[in-house]
Each structure stands twice: as C-alpha cells, then as structure tokens.
Design a protein with these regions (language model features):
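Carbohydrate-interacting/catalytic domains
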Residues: 1-149
Length: 149
C-alpha cells in the first residue's frame, strides 16, 4: 500500500486487514471516549480541569494526571509509559478512595482480545503525594485511562 496522499482516495480495503482494523477500532473508541467524557474538553483553560499526579518520574519516564469536568462525576486518570520496559505492578497515586475502571488501554484491552474488564479499588497507601493508590500492569509504551467519580 502507499502512504497517505492528498491527491488520491484512502485505501479503505486495508481496513479489512487485522492490524488496520485494530487501529480503526482504536480511533473509533478514542472518539467515543472523547464524546462520552466532558473532562476531555471542558475546563481546558482552567486548572480545575487538570491535576498532575506524577510529572517527576523521569527515571522511569512514566507520567500520570487527572482530567475533570465541572461536575466531578466522570473524572479520568491517565497513566502513560514512554519507555520500552513494561512495569508489571506499577503503583499510581490517586486523590480519593473508590473504584478505578479501565476504559482504554492500548496494549491489554479492546484491540487484541475483545472486551477487557478491569477495575481496581484504591487502597489507603500514600503514593505520588496522594493518600490512596492502586497497582496496575503498565505495558511498554502503554497508555491506560481509568474513569472514577
């Protein structure tokens, strides 16, 4: 197949191949999540919509942050690994007690083995300057997004 070219039509037949089909599904799910979770677009220019959890893990190149909307009911926690090393039991700090449900994972979830339900209840264990935390198997070059209230 040829690279994208603004002068020609897209090679839609490629969407039938597994790798391309998975990428198309991933993009579709990203758009669905964007529409479903106002935390991704509301309060964009307001610090109330964003909170760093860990921006200082330079040794492992893993960053985590929270996006919020004005209701605080559909918060999203992002954990991103920028290295080729998987972290089997990565502990991430969270601001409150509750259940954190995986909604997007570019390694373990929706794009390789079908629906993947994963929820973790936070425990009272300080991490990243937060009073609660939970552990998650973070894949190499992986991004995990969790919803919580």
């Amino acid at each position: 197949y040829h690279e994208w070219d603004e002068k020609t039509a897209l090679d839609w037949y490629l969407a039938e191949e597994p790798q391309h089909r998975d990428l198309l599904k991933y993009y579709s799910d990203l758009l669905h999540i964007y529409q479903k979770y106002p935390a991704l677009y509301r309060l964009d220019s307001d610090w109330n919509g964003f909170q760093w959890i860990n921006a200082n893990d330079g040794d492992r190149s893993i960053f985590s942050f929270i996006r919020r909307d004005e209701t605080g009911k559909k918060n999203l926690l992002f954990v991103i690994n920028f290295t080729p090393m998987a972290r089997d039991d990565y502990r991430v700090g969270v601001p409150k007690s509750g259940t954190y449900t995986l909604i997007l994972d570019n390694e373990h979830g929706l794009y390789k083995r079908g629906e993947h339900a994963f929820s973790k209840r936070s425990v009272k264990s300080e991490c990243d300057g937060q009073p609660y935390s939970f552990a998650y198997p973070l894949p190499a070059y992986g991004t995990a997004v969790f919803r919580f209230n």
